[in-house]
Amino acid sequence: MIFGFFSCQQPAEKQTKEMPMFCSWYTYNENEDFDSICRSFTELGIDGIVLKAGTAEEFRKTVPVAKKHGLTVYAWVWTINNHPIAAEHPEWLSYNRDGYSIADSMAYVGYYKFLSPIIPGVREGICKQVDEICKIEGIEAISIDYHRMVDVVLPTTIWPNYGIVQDREYPQWDYGYHPEMIKAFKEKHGYDPREQE
């Protein structure tokens, strides 16, 4: 898992909390009592929440609730994978080495819908999403996640979960071959990367 934190607020004059700080990941679900969950986090000694919400509007709704319970809020944002623009623009999704779009095939799990960052609209959509979330009052930082492609080779311990053996790189699991990516690669390097062994 690759992730990073990007601050959304001005630097504090001095640190007010003792270290270490204890945080928990949580994916917001409108069918759950978020107020009760935040209260439980506080009772358990959790200082902060790395919150995944589907939309900026959900962050606007949940952040004040978490803050009411004294929780520091970090937005947990998936960028390349399962981004809201994927549903609007399936043609922007990544292709595997066999030439199949992840829109039409599945890579391990159904929620693996990785966008191709060569597409200007993908980059613009991610920047817009991050910018909008950073402007939400009460969010301290953003944790960027899934800012990568599909795993080419999974850890051996989970092969049985998928009924696969990956003793080498297989083209059906090797993503990042969107036609626009191939075109840009050819222009820069003079050959098609799929021709390499």
Where are these regions (language model features)?
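Boundary/entry segment of secreted carbohydrate-active catalytic domains
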Residues: A12-I37
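Bacterial Sec-dependent N-terminal signal peptides
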Residues: M1-Q15
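Hydrophobic faces of well-ordered beta-strands that scaffold small-molecule active sites
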Residues: P20-W25, I49-L51, V73-V77, I142-I144
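Surface-exposed amphipathic alpha-helices with a cationic face
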Residues: T42, R60-G70
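Catalytic domains of carbohydrate-active enzymes, especially glycoside hydrolases
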Residues: Y28-E58, I136-I139
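Active-site-adjacent "subsite" loops/lids of carbohydrate-active enzymes
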Residues: Y74-I136, L154, P171, P193
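Active-site neighborhood of glycoside hydrolase catalytic domains
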Residues: I136, V150, V165-E197
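Active-site beta-loop-alpha junctions enriched in small/polar residues
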Residues: W25-N29, G54, W78-N82, Y146-M149
